[in-house]
């Protein structure tokens, strides 16, 4: 009987390995630049032609290699970074498998030039399709130069999957942006077809590097983070205020021990950290570094090394969430970046340009080919304190997001109702401990929906419904976490009838409903008597409120813990209780609202992620009136 199983030839093994490691030109750039960083390079230049299809050249001034090491680096699983099994669990380098160079050389025309600093001359190796064609001494500067020509020349099926030059160039730019952000102390230069796209010099801080690559305007809306955690963990970097957000994940740069990762645990923690601060479908812009004991994280999970596995996932997740929430909560409202202001100094931009996927053009959804300065980060189309960002209407704020019918139904306008100034309008009494909102000079109420205030030279417009929504939500949340929400006894119990499905849900969740402030007793069949409801919601439509909360329980499902969707339920309750738009407020009511905002965490945004206030500087107003 003939033998069916046989050992594959080395060249075919390398091509198979290349399928895992080398997906596109950007994958080649990533592997080569990571090798340069591991070699201690302080200057790295990347030259590409035709989006990396024709040429990729990476030049570095790292430690270089001897003749023997130059030959060995082309062998599979040959590496200087791992010697024993235990080394896999304390990795401090970006590379470690010894697969990249032989895999790349197997599918390209590969040239390696390298020299040790102490040697008089270097060495050149020419490889084609994994076979060494020529080797000789060469005059090269200390460091390493690797050229990759005609990628996938011998695997045409793989080459057919490459996109347009602009698309591949965009992916290379994105890869280099990640690597450059991770190493501010390293100089990077990026060239395409002989033209320099961007260059970043050695910088002393992450702020300077982020300003070069993401844009000065973006960095002005970012906040520094520094937090020590359990088990020696440390989180540091920059996070955006809620004002700066994007529709995709392209603005989130997360690193573990200096390695860029896209980990589900970290992504979930970031989403939790910004929960109820961003509108649905929006994501923050951030550059975050998590330093952790290498023995507590496994990076040998995926060929791209973008996925990791933590030994204590819950510990890492909760540490990141708490660090983000604490930093976002501690930033005073008055310090939230307004146009031209920043929590720290941003250096002048030189000639760097971010090369990243353009997420704003549907026709180019898979074509990262936008090359212009400052496009590495973008402001949201959801407004925040700057008036220039307003693109949404009042109607979309009230009815759709709150889930309460009729929330935005406006009464007929009248001269009295359009803009009202209370007779006793006066500057708020300021003390040394006055918060931002309490220090505002209250001018009046516009269209019974917005409070008009003045802060020094700035004009402030406050959305009364969004502000009350945040206040009510935080009050309910605080009471719930304390054990139970305060209840109000009804003089006459309200009998509610449900269908069979919802009736079973009410019966099953009566304890949870009681903790939320609703005391319900079975009244026979699928009927229940409501005897108590949250004191804060005593003015709300009790029947509709209970039915809405029960519907939320039905949406959660029996298999999920109530706490998972707790904030959604509390938000629904807050929507019923709060002051609506088009509701006339007295001066004392408006002043009480301002005072309460200062006592409320995350008061710059409602729980849906919309801003509670907008700010115009005097300069902005003068420009609008053509006076500047």
Curated annotation (Swiss-Prot):
> What are the GO BP annotations of this UniProt entry?
mismatch repair
PROSITE patterns, per the entry: DNA_MISMATCH_REPAIR_1
Entry's Gene Ontology molecular function annotations: ATP binding; ATP hydrolysis activity; ATP-dependent DNA damage sensor activity; mismatched DNA binding
InterPro entries linked: DNA_mismatch_repair_CS (IPR014762), DNA_mismatch_repair_MutL (IPR020667), DNA_mismatch_S5_2-like (IPR013507), HATPase_C_sf (IPR036890), MutL/Mlh/PMS (IPR002099), MutL/Mlh/Pms-like (IPR038973), MutL_C (IPR014790), MutL_C_dimsub (IPR042120)
- Give the span(s) annotated as Disordered: 332-416
Swiss-Prot/TrEMBL keywords: DNA damage, DNA repair
Q: What superkingdom does the record give?
A: Bacteria
- Which protein, by its recorded name, is this? DNA mismatch repair protein MutL
**Protein source organism:** Syntrophotalea carbinolica (strain DSM 2380 / NBRC 103641 / GraBd1) (Pelobacter carbinolicus)
Q: What is the lineage of its organism?
A: Bacteria, Pseudomonadati, Thermodesulfobacteriota, Desulfuromonadia, Desulfuromonadales
């Amino acid at each position: 009987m003939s033998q069916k199983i046989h050992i594959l030839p080395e060249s075919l093994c390398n091509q198979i390995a290349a399928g895992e490691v080398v997906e596109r030109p950007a994958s080649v750039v990533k592997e080569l630049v990571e090798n340069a960083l591991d070699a201690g390079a302080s200057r790295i230049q990347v030259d590409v032609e035709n989006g990396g299809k024709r040429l990729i050249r990476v030049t570095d001034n790292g430690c270089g290699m001897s003749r023997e090491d130059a030959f060995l680096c082309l062998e599979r699983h040959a590496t200087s970074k791992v010697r024993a099994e235990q080394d896999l669990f304390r990795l401090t380098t970006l590379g470690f498998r010894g697969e990249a160079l032989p895999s790349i050389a197997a599918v390209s025309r590969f040239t390696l030039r390298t020299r040790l600093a102490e040697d008089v001359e270097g060495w050149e190796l020419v490889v084609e399709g994994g076979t060494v064609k020529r080797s000789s001494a060469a005059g090269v500067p200390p460091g390493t130069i690797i050229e990759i020509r005609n990628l996938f020349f011998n695997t045409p099926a793989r080459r057919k999957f490459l996109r347009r030059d602009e698309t591949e160039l965009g992916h290379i730019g994105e890869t280099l942006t990640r690597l450059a952000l991770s190493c501010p102390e390293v100089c990077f230069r990026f060239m395409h077809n002989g033209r320099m796209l961007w260059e970043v010099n050695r910088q002393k801080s992450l702020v300077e590097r982020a300003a070069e690559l993401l844009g000065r305007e973006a960095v002005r809306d970012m906040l520094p983070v520094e937090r020590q955690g359990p088990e020696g963990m440390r989180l540091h970097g920059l996070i955006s205020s809620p004002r700066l957000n994007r529709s995709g994940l392209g603005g989130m740069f997360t690193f573990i021990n200096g390695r860029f990762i896209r980990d589900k645990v970290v992504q979930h923690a970031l989403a939790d950290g910004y929960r109820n601060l961003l509108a649905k479908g929006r994501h923050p812009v951030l550059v975050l570094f998590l330093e952790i004991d290498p023995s507590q994280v496994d990076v040998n999970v995926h060929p791209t090394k973008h996925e990791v596995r933590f030994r204590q996932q819950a510990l890492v997740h909760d540490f990141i969430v708490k660090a983000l929430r604490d930093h976002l909560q501690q930033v005073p409202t008055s310090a939230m970046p307004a146009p031209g202001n920043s929590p720290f100094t941003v250096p002048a931009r030189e000639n760097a340009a971010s090369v990243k996927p353009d997420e704003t053009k549907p026709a180019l959804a898979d074509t990262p080919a936008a090359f212009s300065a400052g496009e590495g980060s973008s402001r949201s189309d959801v407004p925040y304190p700057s008036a220039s960002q307003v693109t949404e209407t009042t109607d979309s704020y009230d009815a759709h997001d709150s889930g309460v019918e009729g929330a935005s139904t406006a009464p007929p306008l009248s001269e009295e109702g359009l803009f009202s100034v209370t007779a006793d309008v006066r500057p708020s009494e300021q003390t040394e401990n006055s918060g931002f909102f309490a220090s505002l000079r209250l001018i009046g109420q516009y269209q019974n929906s917005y409070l008009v205030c003045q802060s020094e030279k700035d004009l402030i417009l406050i959305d009364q419904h969004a502000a009350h929504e945040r206040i009510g939500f935080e009050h309910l949340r605080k009471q719930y976490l304390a054990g139970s929400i305060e209840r109000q006894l009804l003089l006459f119990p309200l009998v509610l009838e449900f269908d069979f499905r919802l009736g079973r849900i009410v019966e099953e969740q009566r304890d949870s409903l009681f903790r939320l402030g609703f005391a319900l007793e079975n009244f026979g069949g699928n009927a229940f008597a409501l005897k108590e409801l949250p004191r804060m919601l005593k003015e709300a439509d009790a029947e509709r409120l209970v039915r809405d909360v029960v519907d939320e329980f039905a949406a959660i499902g029996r298999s999920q813990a109530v706490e998972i969707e707790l904030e959604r339920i509390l938000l629904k309750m807050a929507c019923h209780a709060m002051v609506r738009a088009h509701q006339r407020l007295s001066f004392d009511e408006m002043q009480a609202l301002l005072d309460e905002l200062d006592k409320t965490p995350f008061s710059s945004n409602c729980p849906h992620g919309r801003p509670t206030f907008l700010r115009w500087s005097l300069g902005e107003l003068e420009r609008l009136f053509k006076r500047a």
